[in-house]
Amino acid sequence: IKEIRKDVGSGFHMNRLLQGDVGSGKTLVALLVMLISIDNGFQACLMAPTEILATQHYTTLSKMLSKMNLRIEILTGSTKKAKRTDIHESLINGTIDVLIGTHALLEEVVQFKNLGLSIVDEQHRFGVAQRAKLWKKNTNPPHVLVMTATPIPRTLAMTFYGDLDVSVIDELPPGRKKVKTVHRFDSSRLQVFQFIEDEIKKGGQVYIVYPLIEESEKLDYKDLMDGYESITRRFPLPDYKVSIVHGKMKPEAKDYEMNAFAKGQTQIMVATTVIEVGVDVPNASVMVIESAEKFGLSQLHQLRGRVGRGNKDSVCILMFKSNLSDNAKKRIKILKDS
């Protein structure tokens, strides 16, 4: 925070990368920088790669700023036309203080009266040209803060983001424990299921994530529908309740399942990467990632960040078919070391 405050108060244009694991407090830092910007008479915007993440930021920041006389709006692909027009007009006349959104912020029609701060979350999900487009929304370039949960070695950060200063949040919030990361093969599935059963008996909850919704002839990966059947056989009603969440579900059904899990009404959530962001369940202590070789490092980090949000000992289990490729070995090592 001191580094960023110094940048903002220096009279020069800030260009900074903020790196910190999921749940380390990046949103809080972003909020404080926004308040500095607003206090000096500027508007601020925050761009996220998905509607779920943008909505999560909007909900969090709205709660935090509820007692302040500030106007916060959200603009995404699903924003209705009338609301969209109102937001466009309010941005230009300066009555919106903070705008949160997705790629919708990049549209030509989105113009600000006095943009002083641009924040980009999960910046690696956006191209350089896209980020630059956001920064050109003002006559004078705004201060820029880009955030990532994926650990980037400092030498690599200098290579890819040489124009950015780097700040690292290397501490977890008080009471938060580091998530243990292990890998297991399909041959150990019975032991993994037994571990899940033991955790549920202790009062914990479990995520099981799949790369695909349905079986594919082209891709030899575990799929969610098949997995859901085998999990409900192994963990049957009435002793166990299992939620299922994927991208083809209607938003209301998805929200219902997510809320049931968040309230502790179900013990297991079987899902695709839609739960990569936007789900905060402190009681969840186990994350099982099926066909882990299918996921990139940033996705694995985000998924692992869904557990370990309370004070329980938590574990992330990466499931593989059999032999590990060199790439898989490298990813596991990076995850275990971070």
Which residue ranges define each predicted feature?
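Inter-lobe coupling/hinge segments of SF2-like helicase ATPases
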Residues: K2-I334
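C-terminal or mid-to-C-terminal helical accessory/interaction module adjacent to the motor/catalytic core
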Residues: D337-S338
